């Protein structure tokens, strides 16, 4: 193929915004029942509706919740753990529209199981132990009857006969992960309390289950205010396992002994993360095969590994796969299923045979493909940052077999900041990154200090320093790449969503390095966020900024909206009108302030969208609007036809 010389940003790309919006689904929770595998799909072409899909042993696939039923819970606002499979083949799921639990039998329409008016449910497990009268679910319930900011969380038992509910445990701000021992005689669960987030400190509880289904003898067996516990799980032999970061890394442990003599044994101590930041319910990184061995995934140096730990020798054996990210791992007798992402193909639901170790893709997140020659693969970089420390990022060079940039030019750079902020970016194939690299942009996706996957100390770098450390690392990643001659420092943009949007706004306000930026539902006013957010994150800022309202002066000082006189760069803001995590008033206020300053600015508000865009039309419009904006600021004309964006002061 003959290379055509065109300015960076002008390159024609096969990766269109319409392709990304319409052909990409959101893969979520995985569940197993015997040889059956089920998972959730968020479908942009169905207005973001979440569908539970079942794949039987014979390979047939079918939707379990028909339209208009939407299997998504608003518990903790971010949801997760929205469905469970029952022994009789039925599905129980939370319906987004009314947040009630519905039972969908293999034949017939879903029928409401619960009938509350202000309840939300998540993380349900069946409790239908043979030879007992119990036929119920045990789940987390949020009661929003009196207040959403003070919603009451409990563990409840829900009868599968008539939906009646019985409170099993209460008295803490948050509950998650109820896990029943295989014989039904004990229940484990997690709690945490304000101001902690689950990755700061959480507590693992264990109780006996009486014959009448009530809990007795509840006691703490691990965790605390400075130790994070993740995913309690029972082995087939009835031994409780969990992940803890007590050593600085989320490692696996098992509880040996009973009562006061119980002790936690580290199974395979190593500088690796077997746990994750519990942003949603139902997360899973390990399980047990038919021989009682642990099949697990862990993260080292920003990449996921798959492994098996022998139940007797505790020796860890890595399992080679083509996947660099592995999540939602569920384990059956002789197989496992997970969501896997490679560096060259979209994420997929994958089944691995634990005997042959062969992998089968059951469902790809995208029905579209792109020639490998167009794919930019991540280069992991470690770069110097403030305080003599090092930070991490993933660099993607521009790649398009049909084009090259002018000989005397270096590519423009887009610096991406992930959301959370207690989260991480991964090297897995991402259409949203390939959209830019195939058009001639370089991209660096920054795992700034505070990101997960590098141990507790790295995660704690953001304690009290949000808006400082993340911004420093974003700037220093760009400087590092410019210093080695990979990008043009005079044509740099920064973009991010949610917490990444806050990093973007801070960088454009408190630094003068970037020429422009794009904030997707980003935070401009920390004081407003502290006053007007949901319960799960209502004290999150205590750790990231300082206690509210005692540290109000610091909240003011870290809020970009208060210092618009320091702005010197254009920006585009993209916001959902139904966002409860970051109210749209924040985007409007930031837009008004930037416009008054006389800087180029654009604002797009999307009806029906919340915190994160789910509808195909929104996803397409947002991507194209951002590209159009960069074209106007950097002085290039994107290939193809793009609807113009109204840009004030330009």
Region locations from a protein language model:
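Sequence/structural signature of beta-propeller modules
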Residues: 1-36, 42-51
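A short beta-strand motif characteristic of beta-propeller blades
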Residues: 14-21, 62-73, 109-115, 164-169, ...
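Conserved beta-propeller blade repeats
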Residues: 23-36, 70-91, 118-137, 171-187, ...
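Non-catalytic accessory segments flanking enzyme active sites
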Residues: 26-29, 40-41, 50, 62-63, ...
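A flexible loop/linker signature enriched in serine peptidases of the S9 family
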Residues: 41-51, 71-77, 93-101, 115-121, ...
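Short loop/turn segments that connect beta-strands within beta-propeller blades
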Residues: 56-59, 105-108, 159-163, 209-213, ...
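Cap/lid segment of the alpha/beta-hydrolase catalytic domain
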Residues: 195, 365-490, 497, 531, ...
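Active-site-proximal cap/loop segments of hydrolase catalytic domains
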Residues: 448-650
């Amino acid at each position: 193929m003959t290379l055509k010389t065109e300015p960076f940003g002008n390159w024609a790309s096969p990766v269109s915004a319409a392709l990304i919006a319409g052909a990409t689904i959101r893969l979520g929770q995985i569940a197993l029942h015997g040889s059956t595998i089920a998972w959730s799909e968020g479908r942009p072409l169905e207005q973001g509706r979440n569908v539970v899909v079942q794949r039987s042993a014979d390979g047939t696939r079918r939707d379990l919740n028909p339209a208009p039923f939407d299997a998504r819970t608003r518990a903790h606002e971010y949801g997760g753990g929205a469905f469970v499979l029952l022994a009789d083949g039925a599905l129980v799921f939370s319906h987004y529209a009314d947040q009630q639990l519905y039972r969908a039998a293999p034949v017939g329409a879903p029928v409401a199981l619960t009938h509350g008016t202000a309840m939300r449910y998540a993380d349900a497990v069946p409790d239908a132990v043979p030879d007992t009268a119990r036929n119920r679910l045990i789940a987390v319930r949020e009661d929003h009857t009196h207040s959403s900011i003070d919603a009451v969380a409990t563990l409840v038992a829900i009868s599968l006969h008539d939906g009646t509910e019985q409170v099993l445990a209460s008295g803490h701000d948050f509950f998650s992960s109820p896990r029943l021992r295989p014989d039904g005689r004990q229940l484990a669960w997690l709690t945490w309390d304000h101001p902690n987030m689950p990755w700061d400190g959480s507590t693992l509880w264990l109780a006996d289950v009486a014959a009448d289904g009530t809990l007795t003898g509840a006691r703490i067996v691990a965790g605390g205010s400075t130790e994070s516990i993740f995913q309690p799980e029972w082995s087939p032999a009835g031994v409780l396992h969990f992940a803890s970061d007590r050593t600085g890394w989320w490692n696996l442990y098992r509880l040996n002994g009973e009562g006061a003599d119980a002790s936690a044994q580290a199974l395979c101590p190593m500088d690796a993360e077997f746990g994750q930041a519990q942003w949603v319910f139902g997360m899973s990184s390990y399980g047990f095969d038919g021989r009682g061995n642990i099949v697990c995934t862990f993260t080292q140096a920003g990449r996921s590994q798959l492994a098996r730990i022998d139940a007797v020798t505790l020796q860890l054996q890595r399992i080679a796969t083509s996947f660099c990210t592995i999540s939602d791992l569920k384990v059956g007798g002789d197989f496992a299923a997970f969501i896997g992402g490679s560096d060259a193909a979209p994420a997929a639901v994958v089944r691995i045979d634990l005997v042959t170790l062969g992998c089968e893709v059951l469902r790809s997140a995208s029905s579209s493909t792109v020639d490998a020659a167009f794919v930019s693969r991540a280069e992991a970089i470690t770069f110097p940052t403030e305080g003599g420390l090092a930070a991490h990022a993933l660099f993607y060079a521009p790649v398009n077999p049909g084009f090259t940039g002018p000989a005397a030019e270096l590519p423009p750079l887009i610096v991406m900041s992930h959301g959370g902020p207690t989260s991480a970016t991964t090297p897995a194939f991402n259409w949203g990154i390939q959209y830019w690299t195939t058009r001639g942009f370089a991209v660096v996706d920054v795992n700034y200090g505070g990101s997960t996957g590098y141990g507790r100390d790295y995660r704690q770098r953001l304690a009290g320093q949000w808006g400082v450390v993340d911004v420093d690392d974003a700037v220093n990643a760009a400087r590092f790449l410019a210093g080695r001659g990979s990008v043009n420092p005079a044509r740099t943009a920064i973009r991010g969503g949610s917490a990444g949007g806050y990093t973007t706004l801070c960088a454009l306000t408190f630094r003068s390095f970037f020429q422009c930026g794009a904030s997707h539902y980003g935070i401009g006013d920390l004081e407003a966020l502290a006053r007007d957010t949901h319960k799960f994150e209502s004290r999150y800022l205590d750790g990231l900024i300082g206690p509210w309202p005692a540290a109000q002066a610091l909240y003011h000082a870290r809020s970009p909206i208060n210092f618009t006189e320091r702005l010197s760069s254009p920006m585009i803001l993209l916001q959902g009108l139904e966002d409860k995590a970051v109210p749209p008033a924040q985007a409007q206020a930031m837009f008004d302030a930037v416009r008054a300053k006389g800087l180029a600015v654009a604002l797009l508000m999307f009806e029906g969208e919340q915190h994160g865009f789910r509808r195909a039309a929104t996803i397409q419009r947002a991507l194209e609007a951002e590209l159009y904006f960069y074209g106007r600021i950097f002085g290039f004309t994107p290939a193809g036809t793009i609807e113009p964006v109204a840009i004030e002061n330009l």
